[in-house]
C-alpha cells in the first residue's frame, strides 16, 4: 500500500519541478531527452510536448514503456531530492489532447506557438530520494499494488 505521507511529498515535488529526463528504447536502441512537463496528480500523469519525428518519440511509438528522472540541481548533498520513475506514454488526441494542451500552455506560455503533439506519461512506479528527510531517505509510490 502507498504511504499517504510519501504520496504527499512526491506530489509536492513533482508540482514544484518542470523538467524531466525521459528514456525510451526498443530492442538495442535507446535514447534520452529532457522535456518540460505538467503534473496531473489526479491521474498521476505527466503531460509533455515533443515532436513525433524525434528519436525518442519514434522509440516511444514502438515501445510505450519509458523510464526517467526528475531532479533538483542542489550543490549540497544534504538537500538532494530527485525521482526515478517508470511509466507508459501515449500520444494524445481529441478532447484529451486539447485539455492537456490548455494546461501545458498555461504553465509554459511560449508553447502556444508550437504545434508539437502532446503526450501523456502515466506513472507506474516512483522512487524518490529526499536527503532533506535524512541521508538516503527513500519514498515510494506504485500504481499497481504488489500481490
From Swiss-Prot:
Classification via InterPro entries: Split_barrel_FMN-bd, UPF0306
The similarity comment for this entry is: Belongs to the UPF0306 family.
Q: List the HAMAP family.
A: UPF0306 (MF_00764)
> Which protein are we looking at?
UPF0306 protein YPK_3704
- Give the species this sequence originates from: Yersinia pseudotuberculosis serotype O:3 (strain YPIII)
